[in-house]
A protein has these predicted regions:
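Transmembrane alpha-helices and immediately adjacent membrane-cytoplasm interface residues
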Residues: 33-58
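Residue signature of alpha-solenoid helical repeat architecture, marking inter-repeat boundaries
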Residues: 43, 80-84, 118-121, 159
Length: 171
């Protein structure tokens, strides 16, 4: 796991090497080396361990996702802001099964740092609304559900929001 700035330095050094290959008229080598530099740039914006954790989470393998996230030792140094948001988002989702208080902390931090996609932000707010509901904070849960409904433009979370509203009537 490289620091985020080291990834950019490596990408720039590889790009300089590719330019040298172009100058030496080794065009195919230069193109191949540029593709290699592109991988480092891609991993600057999309962290490889977070991508692998998402894949494990899609398979409902929480232990595998936790293992991949464990490789990120210092998220502040290794990840850009949005990736830190997703790092906390993934931790919050995994902890919501076992420790609600800890999950709430991670999900709030993820919302504060920001998530790239609106449906991820809506899901985080819906999770927070569920946690607030279990802790008998009805007003906060209602506000979070309203925010999640605004963010859910494609209607992917419509059923979950309806279920939570039905449960809230019982409180």
């Amino acid at each position: 796991m490289f620091n985020k700035n080291i990834k950019l330095i490596i990408a720039s050094l590889i790009t300089i090497w590719a330019i040298y290959q172009f100058i030496q008229v080794h065009i195919m080598n230069g193109i191949s080396i540029l593709l290699l530099a592109g991988i480092f740039v891609l991993f600057y914006f999309k962290n490889e361990f977070i991508l692998l954790a998402f894949l494990q989470l899609r398979k409902q393998n929480f232990e595998g996702a936790k293992k991949w996230l464990g490789y990120i030792k210092k998220p502040e140094a290794a990840l850009i802001t949005k990736q830190q948001g997703y790092f906390n988002y993934l931790h919050g989702i995994m902890l919501s099964q076992t420790n609600m208080t800890q999950a709430e902390k991670f999900l709030r931090k993820a919302v504060r740092l920001g998530l790239s996609m609106d449906h991820d932000l809506a899901m985080a707010k819906l999770q927070l609304a569920g946690i607030a509901m279990t802790k008998r904070r009805k007003r906060e849960a209602t506000n979070l559900m309203a925010e999640a409904k605004k963010l859910d433009k494609n209607g992917m979370l419509k059923e979950q929001i309806q279920q939570m509203k039905q449960q809230m009537k019982k409180i």
